[in-house]
């Protein structure tokens, strides 16, 4: 598969593809560091140094997409899971557009997990394999319907085997029940976890308001959650994320 074909498979926007294909090939001795967990910081720094200047992160994006093709050569799951997993790149450049009004890539610190074959998109959810547990992540485009979540969980169990599943997310916040209707899908999602260790969390600004740099007063009010969370913050409250252990038979 060529890089252009790969970009088409993951539905990367044409404007981004043009920028990606203009970046020269990055040496394999640098790319291999991006898919080696203990070398992630070193690899990212080396790639950035090799590609300077790198306006809006397109150089790093191109390098990571080149690396993804190397990952594909030894990928342990199906082509479908590989492509769905790597669509994270498309999701992130579109989120950059939503946040800042232009395409860009600023999630290279995260996508090395996908490149290293330790984080997979299986249906609606992502699963990251670590030594002591399987860490569950919720992509921004996940549909939190019980049937879809159950299918994702069952498929993940079949592929990844037994092991405790845990999650750390703003979606598990103990503050959300006071901000959402009882029928909310987010609250239904929460009920599948034993929730513990709430702590202050700023990432909610990115996920709910699409821009982490806005002041409380400037936060948008386009959705009911945005309006309620903005009022919560303006009242001087601190929003918390939390950790959770997935129940044995979730998403019923």
Question: Positions of the model-derived regions?
Answer:
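Non-catalytic substrate-recognition and accessory regions of acyl/acetyltransferase enzymes
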Residues: 1-144, 161-164, 175-252
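Well-ordered, non-membrane alpha-helical segments in soluble/globular domains
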Residues: 145-159
């Amino acid at each position: 598969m060529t890089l252009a074909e790969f970009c088409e498979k993951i539905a990367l926007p044409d404007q981004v593809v043009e920028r990606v294909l203009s970046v020269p090939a990055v040496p394999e001795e640098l790319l291999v560091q991006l898919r080696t967990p203990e070398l992630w910081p070193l690899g990212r720094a080396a790639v950035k140094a090799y590609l300077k200047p790198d306006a809006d992160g397109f150089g790093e994006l191109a390098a990571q997409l080149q690396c993804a093709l190397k990952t594909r050569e030894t990928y342990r799951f199906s082509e479908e899971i590989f492509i769905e997993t790597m669509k994270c790149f498309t999701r992130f450049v579109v989120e950059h557009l939503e946040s800042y009004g232009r395409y860009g890539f600023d999630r290279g610190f995260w996508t090395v997990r996908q490149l290293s074959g330790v984080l997979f998109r299986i249906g609606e959810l992502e699963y990251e394999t670590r030594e002591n547990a399987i860490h569950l992540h919720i992509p921004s485009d996940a549909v939190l319907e019980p049937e879809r979540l159950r299918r994702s969980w069952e498929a993940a169990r079949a592929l990844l085997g037994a092991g405790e599943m845990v999650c750390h997310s703003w979606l598990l916040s103990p503050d959300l029940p006071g901000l959402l209707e009882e029928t909310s899908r987010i609250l239904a999602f929460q009920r599948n976890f034993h929730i513990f260790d709430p702590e202050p969390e700023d990432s909610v600004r990115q996920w709910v308001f699409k821009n982490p740099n806005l002041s409380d007063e400037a936060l948008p009010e386009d959705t009911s959650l945005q309006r309620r969370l903005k009022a919560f913050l303006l009242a001087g409250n601190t929003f918390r994320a939390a950790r959770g252990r997935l129940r044995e038979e979730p998403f019923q």
